[in-house]
Amino acid sequence: MQEHLVVTLDGKDYLVEPGTNLLEFIKSQDTFVPSICYNESMGPIQTCDTCTVEIDGKIERSCSTVIDRPMTVNTVNNDVKDAQKEALDRILEKHMLYCTVCDYNNGDCEIHNTMDAWGLQHQTYEYKEKPYEKDYGPFYRYDPNQCILCGRCVEACQDIEVNETIRIDWDREHPRVIWDNDVPINESSCVSCGQCATVCPCNAMMEVNMEGNAGYMTDTEPGSLAAMVDLTKKAEPGYGPLFAISDSEAEMRKERIKKTKTVCTYCGVGCSFEVWTKDREILKVQPSHDSPANKIATCVKGKFSWGHINSDQRLTKPLVRKNGEFHEVEWDEALNVIADNFTSIKEKYGPDALSFISSSKATNEESYLMQKLARQVIGTNNVDNCSRYCQAPATKGLFRTVGHGGDSGSIEDLEKAAMSVLIGTNTAEAHPVIASRMKRAQKLFGQKIHVFDIRKHEMAERADRFYQPKPGTDLAWLSAVTKYIIDHDLHDKAFIEEWVEDFDEYYKSLETFTMAFAEEATGIPEAELIKFAEECAKAESVVICWAMGITQQDIGSDSSTAISNLLLVTGNYRRPSTGAYPLRGHNNVQGCSDMGSMPDKITGYQSIEADDIRAKFEKEYGVKLNPKVGKDNHEMVEGVHDGEIHSLYLYGEDTGIVDSNINFVQAAFENLDFMVVQDEFLTFTATFADVVLPASPSLEKDGTFTNTERRIQRLYQALKPLGESKPDWKIFQAIANKLGFDWNYKHPSEIMDEIARLTPLYAGVSYERLEGFNSLQWPVHPDGTDEPILYLEGFNFDNGKAKLFPLSFDNYFKQDEVYDIHVNNGRLLEHFHEGNMTYQTPMIKYKVPRAFVEISPELAEDRGIHEGAEVKLISETGEAVLQVHVTDRVKGKEIYIPLNNDAMENGDLGAINLLTNSDVDQYTDTPSYKRTSCRLEVIAKRGKSPLNPNNFRVNKKRHPQYSVQVQKKWERPDYVFPGNQVDK
């Protein structure tokens, strides 16, 4: 194959790699060619025709031209300019330029910028208004009269996010963007990811919060606005002066609109973007092609759910309980109360009578200081975080087999794998941006997706193969598939020989895991498992993603281990697009654990029991550290009931709602001598506290998060803390100093420098290396090099070899005769966890106002109930009253309850964890949330649906197509390619 091709661009020769996009090459040489419909994150769409150039004497679109031969390209001759002007004129026929009074006049309107850069002074075709009104959804609106039909929104919806709602109806007299079968936005299958508004090159598709708020004159009434536009156009002879005025106004906006890079504070994907603020008002969230985890993608939460920042429910002053009621106090008083109580409890009962729970929503630096406060200042290892509730079993399984508790590679690897296997993960709702990458890979590039889940969620519907095992039985089929692969000589013998140990012992342990055994245990037909095993073994590359459907079982650690065993046997580690991906739930649950907020590990998973590790930290901290492993979250609650724990300090965690068996947890809170809660809001858990401290959310501080792919990213302060709230790191420092220590951090970067000194995984991390959209994936070496793909140099054991780990299985699913219904639970797309943050955004609450229970059509028929029925669910530990949504996403006696119950408004009413019990995974103490059974009593047989009728789940169907179907435009009788109009 020829290495380079000669391209002559405007008379100058260049050597270009074959396969290069011509438009991208032209741009790389700082040569201007208009390209309004083109976006580097989406590729050629071919609707605008503005990028025409002359290629070997013929006018063609440069965006869709691949350099596959030597070619001569001209971007400046008269024919090219005439063709480009024709295309630009046609755009202005559809789009009125009223830039100065347009909310989009912020320096990045691609129509304005293109016309200005090209030098267009007058348009040939008069603007023609279309017979359509604006269409408003809850978060964005569409203005057909400003739409140029570039199709970016369609490409984004169909082939980037792959939500498959938006398309262009090219058959109309006046084509326009439509939703589904031409219904209003708010009545469509749209999931409000907002990417259509992100990629729109003008003001046709725009965030509702932007409208009337961005410019100095954009809040003008429509009639007055039209008059201003007409007056301006009559006063100026051409577009040059108009652009000069609008450019000046756009420059003025920089004084009022602040653009700050941040990282999403919801799930573990780690989407980064700029947040646009005017004073405290959040105008929009704008992702970038430079965003390393998400590129231009977002979900409804990251794009639109920021109501919590300015919510009137925010805490703005410390609260101290006096005579049974909370009273606002000054910071010094609150800190004194904390210091006095911590001191007295420590003196009376010892340091291990105090306990600390860190937040997976807070920054790395804050998580580090929480564990430092516990270990250095108090002298206890009783510190933990919410990974105990979800991810600890996955980490345990990976520590056993490959040595690192994190994703094997990057999100990009998930997209490029030949086969993706999803086990117990509702990826489309819990990690929607990752799901979009997989959906795109399947739709456009043929990735095979296999889903194992008890519930038919979106990824199950889209899967090439969907398997429904009985609850809690995944270990059985995973081990049986692994045995079958070895038995039939399909395993990667060379990989195992070089990189894996304990094979013989492991293989012997598989003796009982026959396919017949797996079918009996799981209910999946043997033939289906055999076919999966053969496809898995033969696939060029395999990734396995899993989440709480695996980890929140009493055998979560063993099931996670079985996943890694299968990957090792098939040689699916140490290569791009292979490996294990335990999808982290919270934005910083990975980082919180990395930072040592764990009872047995200090930063970077260094053992607190190791003398040399303690010595290193003792030198830094200036105190002796407690060598005794502390209590985890589960043990803390038990410890309160046993009289061993007397104080609890937690922040950014609504433990009284999200822990299992919350009646038992809440009783523990009542038994504490002293409790401190630190949060944005007076959460349900905070109502049990003695002191409540007002904390600042992510937009009000600097710091770093570490996402599910081990990617460390900076977030920058966009707003001042509201009222007297403070960033968590400042609060920890104030408490430490009240207790006699001398913490003197001026900025979180100093905290990260300390972390890097003490933590090999983060040794090369610095704020300078994380500037802007730069990121690093641990382990980060002292010179700043990182490891996007783990294990390339060997596995994280002394000899560099992975370990196959023998397992057994006797966890058969048996339905109780009394508690005859199995309770599944998890997230919804619109809400995050219990919903404390998301319920503060009114339109999110409008879409999903409350928790509910999904019931199968067959169970509904059996119990004589209908949509909206009210039922009481009763388990061994408690009861919950919920409304019914009847759906085939669940089957038989399986039900599903979302986690969000708006506890700040409803308390624990309807909370799933009224039903869960205290059973845990034996190795990690992770609650068996998914191992819950109940019985059902009917209160009312029918009622109003718990879902808003405009929710996308209610009888809404997707409308898939490939791209914008531009050929339909080309087939219209009123279309002529501009290049064909040029008079040669």
From Swiss-Prot:
It comes from the Bacteria. Keywords: 2Fe-2S, 4Fe-4S, Iron, Iron-sulfur, Metal-binding, Molybdenum, NAD, Oxidoreductase, Repeat. Residues 138-165, 181-211 form the 4Fe-4S ferredoxin-type domain. Residues 3-79 form the 2Fe-2S ferredoxin-type domain. Its cofactor is [2Fe-2S] cluster; [4Fe-4S] cluster; Mo-bis(molybdopterin guanine dinucleotide). [4Fe-4S] cluster 2 binds at C147, C150, C153, C200. This is Putative formate dehydrogenase SAB2186c. It comes from Staphylococcus aureus (strain bovine RF122 / ET3-1).
